[in-house]
Each structure stands twice: as structure tokens, then as C-alpha cells.
From Swiss-Prot:
This is Pre-mRNA-splicing factor cwf2. The lineage of its organism: Eukaryota, Fungi, Dikarya, Ascomycota, Taphrinomycotina. PANTHER family: PRE-MRNA-SPLICING FACTOR CWC2, PRE-MRNA-SPLICING FACTOR RBM22. Belongs to the 40S cdc5-associated complex (or cwf complex), a spliceosome sub-complex reminiscent of a late-stage spliceosome composed of the U2, U5 and U6 snRNAs and at least brr2, cdc5, cwf2/prp3, cwf3/syf1, cwf4/syf3, cwf5/ecm2, spp42/cwf6, cwf7/spf27, cwf8, cwf9, cwf10, cwf11, cwf12, prp45/cwf13, cwf14, cwf15, cwf16, cwf17, cwf18, cwf19, cwf20, cwf21, cwf22, cwf23, cwf24, cwf25, cwf26, cyp7/cwf27, cwf28, cwf29/ist3, lea1, msl1, prp5/cwf1, prp10, prp12/sap130, prp17, prp22, sap61, sap62, sap114, sap145, slu7, smb1, smd1, smd3, smf1, smg1 and syf2. Residues 43-63, 331-352 are annotated as: Disordered. It comes from Schizosaccharomyces pombe (strain 972 / ATCC 24843).
């Protein structure tokens, strides 16, 4: 594309779900064919808008047919009267979510703290990019209150008897129970391939003879998303899966592993909030090198026995102690080569901008440290008789 003697080149790079456009603009060439430096303008935008999975949403979410006499609001079914096996009455879902094809940006991306679209997880959202909920997979940075799931549905104090539904807010459950799998020799590979689409998996335990699998995710939100996405779906043999929450494993080794995982998650969350220098100091203290750190601080400040407070030592940005000391030691290498007068001015300017470590204060403290304490004379003098 050329306009007014300018040439424009557009380069598109794809990375994750974002597209980076690099626009290279060449200046007007002179008669001597001297080229000016090209300007690079980087424009980042989302890869694609969310896709409409279906045209119109089926209105099947109505009250079920009345096979009994009393309607139970908690279980959303009728009780009494006719009895039927709930596992045999399950119907395979006609829609399924495909992350690589259906995910994209929606109106919810502009609102921090938005929930995920339940119909998107089930593969039946008809809103597309106009949806007010997120159309993507949950990430580690997505946090929600303990009383709601990633779709915004309220949790209950206890699980249902069939371990279905939203779940309980008294326990963080990362494990799904998947039944109705066709027993094969490669059942573990099939389960891993289908369920790895919804997030990072920590471990998979498969019972080949019974067609049952227990899948543990690293993130609870991914487990919630996978439960809704794989409910009434099939793997490779046209079966209808029964996806439920897993009960507590009575194995002591499993309980210890869950406790260790919770402690690691809490430690990682705290580490992200602490300064890097503070983490390095903790590591040195753990290895028995706290004395070296104290001596290093004394040498940096030039004051024996002086250790700054944690608020001063671990301040972030340009106000940190280490940045202030580095500014005092290396004000400007390029100006130091030109002349000593310019160096003196740059050091003075840097010291005047120092908020925490002032050179005048340090010099006064060093003078006070070197002061010699003389013995004071007594108030009453005593004379010996020999002196007379």
C-alpha cells in the first residue's frame, strides 16, 4: 500500500489468544535513495470475538415432567410415585464446547471480576461476543468468593446425596468423579486427552474394570468448568458420562498430599505479594547466612551496627535503599568521563533527590561514631600528705 510516497507494511504475529500487528512505515525516499529509519507501531488486540455456538438457545430448562407426587426444589425433581434409575434416564448432550474454536472476547472482558458463561461451558451460548460472561478457560489469576463457583452460582453448606450440583463452600474440591466410561486398555490416555482441554491436571486415577476415573485439577475453577463441560458428554465410544464431585479420600497419604498442596498454594500466594529482596533474605536466613547479610548492610551504609527497618529496606521502585545507594555510587558514568565538575554536580543532584539516605546525615553519624569519650574530672579533689 502506497500513499504520498510512503510505503506501509503490516505484519501480524499470533501469540496465545492475542494478535500483535506491527506496522512498518518507511519514510519518503530522496533522489539519492537515502532511506530514513522506519517507525514501528505495535497494536495489540484480541485474536477473535467469541463465536456463537448455536443460533437460538433451546428452552428445555423447564420443570420436568411429573413422575411423582411431591416436587423437591433442592434436587429439582419429583419424589414419590414412579421410580426410575437416574443413570439410565440420562440423555447425551447434543452440544459441546471446543475451546480452540469457541473462545474469544466478550463484553465481560471489560468488567473485572466477571463470571464465566455456563452456557458456553455446555456449548450452547447464542450470544457470542455480546455475552455478559467470559468465554474462555479459568486462569490462576481468577479468584472468586468461597460461597460461589466460577459461574456465579451460590454454593451450599453440604453436598447433595448424589454429589452433583454446585458443591459446598466448606471444602475446596479439586477432584471429579467420572463414571460410565467404556472399559478399554487405553482408558487412561483417553480420559487424559479429553479432560486436559479444560485445565492443568495434577493426577488421574483410573479403575479399568469398572469404567471409573478420578481426575484432580490444579485449580478449583478448572474443575468446576470441566464438570459442566463434560456432563452428559462422550469420549471415544459414544457413551454418556456421569460427572460428579468426588468424596473425601480416606487414604492418609491422600489427605497428607491435599494438606501439602493447600500449604504450597498459600505459600505461593504470599510469595507473589512479597518483594524479591525480602525472599532472598529469607533464603539466606534459612541457609544460616544471616550474619553475612548484616555485615553487607553495614558496609553499604558505612555505619557499624546500623540495620535499616524493613519498610525502608524492602521499598519498591526508585525509593528502595538499594536503588538509592546505586544512584549515589554511579550517578552517571558518561558524565564522569567528561569532567570532574560535571560529576560533582550530578552527585549533588542525585543526593538531593535521595529520600531515605542523605549523605549529610551519614557523614554526621560517622563523625558522632568517631567521637572520643574523655574522662570527666571529679567534683571533689583529694590530696596526699606527701605532695605538700
Amino acid at each position: 500500500m502506497s500513499e504520498n510516497g510512503l510505503e506501509q507494511e503490516v505484519t501480524v504475529e499470533e501469540k496465545n489468544n492475542d494478535v500483535t500487528e506491527k506496522i512498518l512505515v518507511e519514510g519518503e525516499k530522496s533522489k539519492e535513495y537515502e532511506e530514513t529509519p522506519r517507525k514501528v507501531k505495535i497494536v495489540k488486540r484480541k485474536k477473535q470475538p467469541a463465536r456463537k455456538q448455536i443460533e437460538t438457545r433451546p428452552e428445555y430448562e423447564m420443570e420436568p415432567e411429573q413422575p411423582g407426587q411431591v416436587y423437591n426444589l433442592w434436587y429439582n425433581k419429583w419424589s414419590g410415585g414412579m421410580r426410575q434409575d437416574p443413570l439410565k434416564s440420562q440423555v447425551k448432550s447434543e452440544t459441546r464446547c471446543v475451546i480452540s474454536r469457541d473462545s474469544g472476547y466478550t463484553k465481560a472482558d471489560k468488567n473485572p471480576g466477571s463470571f464465566f458463561c455456563l452456557y458456553f461451558a455446555r456449548g450452547m451460548c447464542s450470544e457470542g461476543s455480546k455475552c455478559e460472561y467470559l468465554h474462555r478457560l479459568p486462569k490462576d489469576t481468577d479468584f472468586f468468593n468461597a460461597n460461589v463457583d466460577c459461574f456465579g452460582r451460590e454454593k451450599h453448606a453440604d453436598y447433595r446425596d448424589d454429589m452433583g450440583g454446585v458443591g459446598s463452600f466448606l471444602r475446596q474440591n479439586y477432584t471429579l468423579y467420572v463414571g460410565g466410561i467404556t472399559p478399554t486398555d487405553d482408558i487412561e490416555e483417553i480420559v487424559s486427552r479429553h479432560f486436559a482441554e479444560w485445565g492443568d491436571i495434577e493426577r488421574i486415577r483410573v479403575l479399568n474394570s469398572r469404567g471409573i476415573a478420578f481426575i484432580t485439577y490444579l485449580n478449583e475453577a478448572n474443575a468446576q468448568f470441566a464438570k459442566e463441560a463434560m456432563a452428559h458428554q462422550s469420549l471415544d465410544h459414544d457413551e454418556c458420562l456421569n460427572v460428579r464431585w468426588a468424596t473425601t479420600d480416606p487414604n492418609p497419604a491422600s489427605q497428607a498430599r491435599n494438606q501439602r498442596r493447600l500449604e504450597e498454594r498459600a505459600a505461593n500466594a504470599v510469595k507473589k505479594l512479597l518483594p524479591k529482596q525480602f525472599l532472598l533474605d529469607l533464603e539466606e536466613t534459612k541457609n544460616g547466612k544471616s550474619g553475612n547479610r548484616k555485615r553487607k548492610l553495614e558496609l553499604e551504609f558505612g555505619l557499624k551496627g546500623y540495620v535499616p527497618s524493613d519498610d525502608l529496606l524492602y521499598a519498591d521502585g526508585a525509593n528502595s535503599v538499594h536503588n538509592q545507594l546505586a544512584a549515589n555510587e554511579f550517578p552517571n558514568k558518561s558524565q564522569s568521563e567528561e569532567g570532574s565538575n560535571d560529576d560533582h554536580k550530578s552527585v549533588t543532584t542525585t543526593e538531593s533527590q535521595n529520600k531515605f539516605v542523605n549523605s549529610q546525615i551519614l557523614s554526621d553519624l560517622q563523625v558522632a561514631k568517631q567521637a572520643v569519650h574523655t574522662n570527666q574530672s571529679a567534683l571533689v579533689s583529694y590530696y596526699d600528705s606527701d605532695e605538700d
